Structure formats: structure tokens, C-alpha cells
């Protein structure tokens, strides 16, 4: 997105930009932090056009606006309008938000405090948005759709051969039924709105004490000098049991935190963070939880294979971590 177009879009919202700071590009969107002529820090987001994205934007913002109105530091709207940009090739949607301070962290920077705060933030978010009336998709349906196409992907004989010859791996074929059963069982549990993407890129940390946000008396997610200053990207929000959210974040932490044991990560995230520091309490079957964690890890493994040449995967730290964890969990076998 060229800077002239970005400025024109900002002008459409009735704002004169004084300085555009940077752009952050993700899978779904491009995010521009800028300061207005009046001195306000704002965030312009361009959303990638894909099936259902407009409804997804509206649903996710409905959830985050509720969380903000109840005192949580989450991304929230500056302007309620959605701008549509079209040309002969594509359609892009743009929306304007308040800017949240803080930074995401590198995977090797995770400490016990970071993980505990993540657990607390998720717990508080769950209790805050529990009664939302937003019409969200079911988390189980989202996962079953994923399950269908990864099953088809790995059923392809040429893919099976490439996995064996280029990656020296075999897939435990029984896991596909096990994953489906875990998703279906979790679907029968009590449900509520979830974030479903509380991973490193969507959590903003600050290493100094923050001023209270306008809706809270004090910073609410803080341990000594470390604070979670914001949660962003609610686009994957869905309805389901909290086990889905916890399993997603735990799986991601397993791959990120090579210097911490799985038991320590579980303790920091769920026992110390979610249950003790947070305002919700998670009680679930550990075997079911582990099944969902393995599913999320396997889905991440699939994405590595789908989007990268197999020959270069052994140079990817997170692929190697995910592969080794899946071998330990008996999902993959070295051949």
C-alpha cells in the first residue's frame, strides 16, 4: 500500500495525518500507526479480502468494543465506518482504531512473567465477554473445516511420499480420527465467546509501568515492571469452551519456549495465570486438552508444509520445534 493512498484513506476519515510511523503486515491485514495533526495516535488497518471477511471484521470489533467498554486494554474503534476500496482485481476494507502502546516480543524473550500475564489476560477477557450476544461461528465448526482439508491434504499419495522422502517423517494415521473426536467432545462443553488467537503476535507488552487506561483505575495486567498493554486481532473470535483458547495458546507457547518444560508452561499459563491471577477458572479433562493441543500443533505443521518448500523447512526454527514436539506426542514418527 503506497503512502499516498494511505494518506487519502486517512483524509477520508476526516483526519489530517502529521506523521505515519510504520507499517506491520500480517497474514490478513496491514496496520499503519500514525499521529494526527491534533496529536492523537491512531491505527489504520487494511483488511485482506477473503470469504466472509466483512462479517468477521464486524463480529470481532463487536467483541473488542464490549471488552474495552468494560475496562480491558484492547484495540477499539476511533471511527465506526468501514471504508471499501475496489479496483478491477480486488476489494480491500479499511477501518480506523485507537493506537495501543507496547510491543510484541521475540519468541526467545518469553519469561515466566510473560506467560502468567497471558494466562491472566485470557482469563479476564473470558469473564468480561462471556455474556456477549455477538453472532459468532462455533469454534468446533471452524476446527472441523480445518480438519477436513488437512485430512485431504495428507491423503494425497504425492504428499505422503514427499513427507517420507524429503522430511523423513511418517504420520500416525490414527490421529485424524482422534483429532475429530476431541473437537466433537469439546463442542459438547459449555460455550462462550473466545479470542482463539492469543499468541505472540497479538499480545502487546510494555516493560515499564503504564498510566491507567481511561476505563480502569490501574493497569490490570502487571507483574513488577512488566505489563500487557493491549490485546489485538479478534478476527478469529468464535464461540466454544475455554479449553479451545487455552489449548491454542499453550500449543503456540510450546513451540516458542524451547527453554521451558511443557509442565512449567502449563503451570504458568493455566494454574498461575488463568486460574489464580485471572477472574475466570478453567476446569477440564487433561486428556481432552492434550488432544486439542496436538491438533493445533499438527495444524501448524500442516501450514509449514503448505506454505514452504519442503527442502528448506529444516532451516526453520519453529518448524523444527513443532516437528520434534509432534514426534514426542506420537503424532509423527521419524522414518
Where are these regions (language model features)?
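All-alpha amphipathic helical-bundle segments outside canonical DNA-binding/catalytic cores
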Residues: 281-293
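ATP/Mg2+ or Mg2+-diphosphate-binding catalytic cores
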Residues: 299-335
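ATP-binding glycine-rich phosphate-binding loop
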Residues: 13-35
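A cross-family kinase active-site recognition segment
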Residues: 108-167, 191
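A glycine-centered beta->alpha junction motif in the catalytic cores
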Residues: 94-108, 156-159, 294-312
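A conserved alpha-helical element in kinase catalytic cores
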Residues: 46-92, 113-116
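Active-site activation/catalytic loop segments of kinase-like enzymes and analogous catalytic loops
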Residues: 243-279, 294-310
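Active-site acidic catalytic loop and adjacent metal/ATP-binding pocket
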Residues: 27-35, 43-44, 180-244
Amino acid at each position: 500500500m503506497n503512502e499516498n493512498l494511505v494518506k487519502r484513506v486517512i483524509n477520508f476519515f476526516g483526519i489530517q495525518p502529521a506523521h505515519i510511523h510504520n507499517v506491520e503486515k500480517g497474514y490478513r491485514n496491514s496496520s499503519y500507526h500514525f499521529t494526527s495533526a491534533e496529536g492523537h495516535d491512531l491505527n489504520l488497518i487494511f483488511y485482506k479480502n477473503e470469504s466472509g471477511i466483512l462479517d468477521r471484521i464486524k463480529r470481532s470489533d463487536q467483541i473488542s468494543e464490549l471488552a474495552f467498554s468494560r475496562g480491558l486494554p484492547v484495540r477499539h474503534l476511533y471511527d465506526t465506518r468501514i471504508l471499501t476500496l475496489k479496483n478491477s482485481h480486488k476489494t480491500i476494507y479499511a477501518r480506523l482504531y485507537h493506537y495501543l502502546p507496547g510491543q510484541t516480543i521475540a519468541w526467545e524473550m518469553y519469561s515466566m512473567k510473560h506467560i502468567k500475564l497471558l494466562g491472566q489476560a485470557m482469563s479476564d477477557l473470558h469473564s468480561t465477554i462471556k455474556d456477549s450476544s455477538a453472532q459468532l461461528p462455533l469454534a468446533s465448526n471452524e476446527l472441523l473445516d480445518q480438519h477436513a482439508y488437512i485430512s485431504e491434504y495428507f491423503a494425497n499419495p504425492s504428499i505422503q511420499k514427499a513427507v517420507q522422502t524429503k522430511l523423513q517423517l511418517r504420520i500416525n494415521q490414527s490421529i485424524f480420527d482422534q483429532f475429530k473426536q476431541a473437537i466433537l467432545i469439546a463442542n459438547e462443553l459449555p460455550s462462550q465467546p473466545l479470542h482463539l488467537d492469543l499468541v505472540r503476535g497479538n499480545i502487546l507488552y510494555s516493560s515499564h509501568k503504564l498510566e491507567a487506561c481511561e476505563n480502569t483505575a490501574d493497569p490490570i495486567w502487571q507483574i513488577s515492571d512488566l505489563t500487557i498493554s493491549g490485546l489485538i486481532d479478534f478476527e478469529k473470535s468464535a464461540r466454544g469452551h475455554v479449553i479451545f483458547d487455552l489449548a491454542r495458546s499453550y500449543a503456540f507457547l510450546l513451540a516458542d519456549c524451547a527453554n521451558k518444560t511443557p509442565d512449567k508452561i502449563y503451570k504458568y499459563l493455566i494454574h498461575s495465570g488463568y486460574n489464580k491471577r485471572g477472574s475466570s477458572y478453567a476446569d477440564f479433562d487433561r486428556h481432552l486438552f492434550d488432544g486439542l493441543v496436538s491438533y493445533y500443533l499438527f495444524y501448524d505443521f500442516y501450514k509449514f508444509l503448505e506454505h514452504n518448500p519442503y527442502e528448506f523447512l529444516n532451516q526453520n526454527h519453529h518448524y523444527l520445534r513443532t516437528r520434534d514436539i509432534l514426534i514426542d506426542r506420537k503424532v509423527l514418527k521419524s522414518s
